């Protein structure tokens, strides 16, 4: 195994048929009839989601902005980076989408944006096609009162970057995109 070498470009899987079995504004579930790499037939369920976006928003005091909310699927409260989804209908670029999400969730804008991911990263590649981009956002300024979705009950706080990184390494921040963002930002800031 060599992660620096190109992987095969031809899929060993064969899709026989595909049908949408569920859709809402946030996800689509697709069921594919497939032939696996070993030649066995079967079905494969795929959750389709838009490109996810996240930002390590760092202020002049080296505090990171975190957003807290109850995560219904996990049944627990979660502290996370400002995150959202790219909306091709509303956002010209993924960065425009992240700027929108940062303002909506936190009431902040950033003057300095650095892309932390060299390409989209897969978030759970055995069940979903969801990928994500992450940025380091600095030179934060207030824009307005946050105007998040009416279904969201968000709390926004700032904590020292090192404390947030320690929380991620200890599992107290366990959102995958947030953990990755903090690790990548730590490396970028060295």
Kindly give the residue locations of the regions a language model identified.
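Conserved Nudix-box catalytic region and its N-terminal flanking loop in Nudix hydrolases
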Residues: 2-5, 10, 44-47, 54-100, ...
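Nudix hydrolase/Nudix homology domain
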Residues: 2-13, 77, 117, 125-128, ...
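Acidic, metal-coordinating catalytic segment for phosphate/diphosphate chemistry
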Residues: 13-54, 60-61
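Active-site segment of metal-dependent pyrophosphate-handling enzymes
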Residues: 28, 50-51, 58-59, 71-73, ...
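Terminal peptide-recognition signature
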Residues: 32, 62, 102, 160
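Conserved hydrophobic "DFG−1" position in protein kinase catalytic cores
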Residues: 34, 57, 66, 136-137, ...
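Short secondary-structure junction motifs
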Residues: 41, 76, 110-112, 177
């Amino acid at each position: 195994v060599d992660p620096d070498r190109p992987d095969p470009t031809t899929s060993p899987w064969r899709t026989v048929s595909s049908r949408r079995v569920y859709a809402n504004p946030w996800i689509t579930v697709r069921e594919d009839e497939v032939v696996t790499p070993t030649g066995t037939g079967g079905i494969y369920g795929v959750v389709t989601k838009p490109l996810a976006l996240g930002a390590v928003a760092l202020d002049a005091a080296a505090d990171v902005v975190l957003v807290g909310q109850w995560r219904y699927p996990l049944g627990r409260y979660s502290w996370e980076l400002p995150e959202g989804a790219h909306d091709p209908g509303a956002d010209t670029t993924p960065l425009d989408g992240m700027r929108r999400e940062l303002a909506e969730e936190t009431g902040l804008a950033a003057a300095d944006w650095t892309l932390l991911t060299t390409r989209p990263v897969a978030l759970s590649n055995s069940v979903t096609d969801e990928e994500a981009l992450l940025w380091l956002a600095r030179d934060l300024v207030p824009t307005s009162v946050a105007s998040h979705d009416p279904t969201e009950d968000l709390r926004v706080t700032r904590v020292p970057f090192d404390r947030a990184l320690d929380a991620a390494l200890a599992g107290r921040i366990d959102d995958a995109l947030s953990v990755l963002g903090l690790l990548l930002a730590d490396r970028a800031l060295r």
